[in-house]
Amino acid sequence: MTRWEELEQLRERARARGIPVARPQTFRLLLDTVRSLNPERILEIGTAVGCSAAGMLLAAPRARLTGIDLQEDCCREARENLVALGCAERALIHNGDASEIIPVLSGTYDFIFLDGPKGHYFEYLPFLKPLLPKGGILFADNVPFFGYADGERKAPRR
């Protein structure tokens, strides 16, 4: 079985457990974008169990990824999944609140995948902009997500 097939099985298992994973068309667009950019450094906000992180690392073999997720169990599982998919040596997963971690990150990221709590997207933007070099890409998932991203609705907390 290829790494890509293993990743697809991981995505299916996560979806069956109710873990949010990018929709198939979004995931394809994400991976196509990462492949075309071939970034050296990727930042992912909202890593969950590492499906998108693994996909981006498989799509960009020279990339290093920094992931952030609030849920400790998700971070632990993401690390395990990255090991299983052969990507762990190129990933650093932070467990914590992205609004506290993003401001202390150093350097720049060629690609930022914003897939965390939708109601905080605007809060993160002033801190993300300095992390993007000229030509860098910010890829935000689910905008607007049922009114959460623009603050019309309060996002539920898990």
Predicted ranges, named:
Residues M1-F111, K118-F139, V143-R158:
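A short alpha-helical cap/connector motif
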